[in-house]
Amino acid sequence: MPITPQEALQRTIEHREIFHDEMVELMRQVMRGEVSDMMVAAILTGLRVKKETIGEIAGAATVMREFSRRVDVADRQHMVDIVGTGGDGSDTFNISTCAMFVAAAGGAKVAKHGNRSVSSKSGSADALEALGAVIELQPEQVASALAHTGIGFMYAPVHHPAMKVVAPVRREMGVRTIFNILGPLTNPAGSPNILMGVFHPDLVGIQARVLHELGAERALVVWGRDGMDELSLGAGTLVGELRDGQVREYEVHPEDFGIAMSASRNLKVADAAQSRAMLLQVLDNVPGPALDIVALNAGAALYVAGVAHSIADGVLRARAVIADGSARARVDAYVAYTRQLAVQA
């Protein structure tokens, strides 16, 4: 017998786990619109207070993937997603979006899953639009862009139409719920490798283990001690690395990669226009902390994608493709190709 919403709520109140298979059935009910908004809000609150388990998160992510519009990719070698949970409140420029262009120029295939801004000044979708790209591409168009440019951006609302069911509840609640940590786990292209930033240190080990449960090959889950959901320049970064079926947790520092420490306030922007300007400065090889943090995160992406032998090797490769202009050229190629796809449609 599948668990009822009332039974699920009772479990969370008693701080007991909803088991993986039960969570799968419960989430299917939610995604089909069979659970009332009041009950959805109550269960989400209960899970948040209790703290979601690996099995609960993996079960919910499985269903979100099931209900998503998939992107079919034939060649997954060196494929990676660079994504964050958001919600770190740092208001920095779009580091992961900038790192996407650098990693693609460095030899990775970047299937990036993202959305508009929720808590920051500029989300990945906002940044790409500011650059002139068309973001609302259909799954087959994303696959085409990935094949031709090494970049495929999957705009979450296009690929997760069932999420409309819970959108009003999430908006009215106005607090983080399990859905904030599900987004980065539900890449519609099924990227086998992922660099994921998280908003809380507890999630470093949890998300790495969830990714293992979901069949990921390699992952780096990161949280900066200054609160950033990226590899940080302002403090050490906690890392949960999934490789060869094992999760290892450790800490890295910018100095490990020959990078000077710098406070995150040096990376702050007020809006998408400022974020675009800082992103293009990095890709024009203007020295400074913005370039350093992009090189660090793109380097980590190249490592987890299997292009680089280590994060340090990845950082060197990232700096090289920024310096020779190929990362900047990748922006122009991607923007032009998405516009071409939109015209053809």
From Swiss-Prot:
- The signal peptide here is none
One GO BP annotation is: L-tryptophan biosynthetic process
What the entry lists under InterPro entries is as follows: Anthranilate_Pribosyl_Tfrase, Glycosyl_Trfase_fam3, Glycosyl_Trfase_fam3_N_dom, Glycosyl_Trfase_fam3_N_dom_sf, Nuc_phospho_transferase
- What does the record list as coiled-coil region(s)? none
A GO CC term attached to the entry: cytosol
Cofactor(s) it depends on: Mg(2+)
The record's keywords, sorted A to Z, are:
Amino-acid biosynthesis, Aromatic amino acid biosynthesis, Glycosyltransferase, Magnesium, Metal-binding, Transferase, Tryptophan biosynthesis
Binding residues for 5-phospho-alpha-D-ribose 1-diphosphate: 84, 87-88, 92, 94-97, 112-120, 124
Record-listed anthranilate 1 binding positions: 84, 115
| Catalysed reaction, written as an equation | N-(5-phospho-beta-D-ribosyl)anthranilate + diphosphate = 5-phospho-alpha-D-ribose 1-diphosphate + anthranilate
The protein's annotated pathway:
Amino-acid biosynthesis; L-tryptophan biosynthesis; L-tryptophan from chorismate: step 2/5
**Is Cell division given among the entry's keywords?**
no
UniProt EC number: 2.4.2.18
Q: Which annotated residues bind Mg(2+) 2?
A: 229-230
Q: Which residues bind anthranilate 2?
A: 170
Gene Ontology MF, one? anthranilate phosphoribosyltransferase activity
The cofactor remark states: Binds 2 magnesium ions per monomer.
> Which residues does the record give as Mg(2+) 1 binding sites?
96, 230
Q: What does this protein do?
A: Catalyzes the transfer of the phosphoribosyl group of 5-phosphorylribose-1-pyrophosphate (PRPP) to anthranilate to yield N-(5'-phosphoribosyl)-anthranilate (PRA).
Q: How does it assemble?
A: Homodimer.
Per the similarity annotation, which family is this? Belongs to the anthranilate phosphoribosyltransferase family.
Q: Which HAMAP family match?
A: TrpD
Protein's name in the database: Anthranilate phosphoribosyltransferase
Originating species: Xanthomonas euvesicatoria pv. vesicatoria (strain 85-10) (Xanthomonas campestris pv. vesicatoria)
Lineage of origin: Bacteria, Pseudomonadati, Pseudomonadota, Gammaproteobacteria, Lysobacterales
Gene it is expressed from: trpD
